C-alpha cells in the first residue's frame, strides 16, 4: 500500500512535486510561463500556517522547468483559495470513474463560493497548456490521509 500524507503537508507537496516532475518529462514547456497557487484558509496549526491561518502550494513553469513548492505566492496567474476543512474531503476523493464524486465536488465548491469560503482569482485558463497536470488530483487523492 502506498504511503499517505496529510493534506498540504511538506510530504504531500513533495509527492505533488515528484508526480508533476515525472508527468512533465517529454513535454515541450519552452515559452510557457505559468504560476498556479492553491491556498487553504483556517489550516490546522501543526501545519505551520502563516499569520492569517493559511497554507498553500504552488506550481511555477518557467524556462522549461517545473517548480512545485509549499507556500503562498504574492501573485499567480491563477490562485484558488478555499477553506481547509471544506476542501479536505474533496482532496481525498478520486474522480476517475466516479462521476457522482465529480458532481459532488462541483456542488461543494459552488456552495463554498456562495458562503465566501472559496474564491478563484486570475485567469481560469492559466493552466490549460499544462496537459501533464491532468492526473494530479487523483494521484494526490490516493495519497491524502
Roles of regions detected by a PLM:
Residues 1-145:
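Feature captures hydrophobic
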